[in-house]
């Protein structure tokens, strides 16, 4: 259940953030180079280091986020200690970490689109929003499909940020499938149970991937 609670907001948020990153990186305006450096930092940072940093930032006592909120008179929650906020906090940290990598993949699909389509659309009076929805998104669909496949598999394999930031707490609010497999296998030494959970996870991922592969025929456009 917690794994699903993580996946449902993570996938659309990550995809939206990655599209924004790709759109910004595709521009040639001043300041884009600096943005490229900033977006590279989360990608190059290991999950262990990133999780430790965010665990400190989200600390209720001395965390930077709650200190900033206090300046505006807002009493911030115990992000990783509150059952309501723990999983949303993990989701947002994961989006921050992954959007650079997936944004780069989407960027490769975006810059491969023939500029002639946009020129023809401009002659027909299409605006930026119309060009994005009618040209960019349809022709980027193979890249978007790849991102959806990989991000869904990664989401099912959620582990390091949970172990470091929450350890499955509070009260099991962030205990996900892989973290449960790890604990039963290497803390409680119930290898049989952990192996069974691993096979269940494998089957779930395989079924979801199969459904995505079948469904992509209806919306993915491989013709440029």
Q: Can you say where each PLM-predicted feature lies in the sequence?
A:
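A structural signal for multi-pass alpha-helical bundles of membrane permease subunits
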Residues: 1-224
